[in-house]
Design a protein with these regions (language model features):
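Extracellular glycan-associated modules
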Residues: 1-214
Length: 214
């Protein structure tokens, strides 16, 4: 089943469901990016029963596949990629078959990056200081792009539900992130906004009702 939403669609109260474990299903997000990215926050909620590694967010350009990539390596262990560099976060609050509210921040000025899971934050780390992400981005949910818009590996695919995806060109304040963790949005993402999302899907991707807040 495929969706091709050229006009912006409000997905409030909805989830993308990816039920199969292969390299075919994914969601392509069309972002409002018209200048280099020098800081960012990406937030999403996901629910998965997998224990193996899986890709949560992939942004590639024609010059680099892992410009921005978030990978859940195992329960409580997450790997972030920025400008082809990577680092791991360990012992994060996590779960199987339950909703995880996640935010990831990065600021190129300092290189500081941080993860938030269910209201608790990691220690700040440094990756790719003074880096800049330029070029037309390809943003995918559900798969890791090893090439621009493709090169998917089924062993890195996401299986489960994902919702409330927002992407900003700044580092959100801790208070704004805590609002998100509790199901509220002070200001929707200016690069990707779940309440006005342009997207296309491939393979078995379904839009279902969310049970995050009932």
């Amino acid at each position: 089943m495929g969706y091709n939403c050229i006009n912006k669609k409000d997905l409030s109260g909805k989830v993308f469901t990816i039920p199969t474990n292969d390299a075919n299903p994914y969601i392509k997000l069309h972002a409002n990016i018209n200048k280099p990215i020098t800081a960012m926050t990406m937030c999403q909620r996901f629910n998965s029963g997998l224990e193996r590694g899986q890709t949560l967010f992939s942004l590639a350009t024609k010059s680099a596949d892992n410009e921005l990539m978030l990978y859940k390596s195992s329960l409580g262990t997450y790997r972030v990629h920025v400008r082809l560099r990577s680092l791991d976060f360990f012992n994060l609050p996590d779960g199987i078959n339950e909703w995880i509210s996640l935010c990831w921040t990065w600021d190129s000025k300092t290189g500081l990056t941080q993860l938030w899971l269910n209201g608790k934050r990691s220690a700040r780390r440094v990756i790719s200081p003074h880096g800049t992400i330029t070029g037309e981005p390809s943003i995918v949910l559900g798969q890791d792009q090893d090439t621009y818009g493709g090169g998917f590996d089924p062993n890195q695919s996401f299986v489960g539900d994902v919702t409330d995806v927002h992407f900003w060109d700044k580092v959100l304040s801790p208070c704004d992130i805590k609002y998100y963790m509790h199901g509220q949005i002070k200001s929707p993402g200016n690069l990707l906004n779940w309440e006005a999302l342009q997207f296309t899907t491939n393979g078995k991707v379904f839009i279902e009702k969310s049970d995050f807040i009932c």
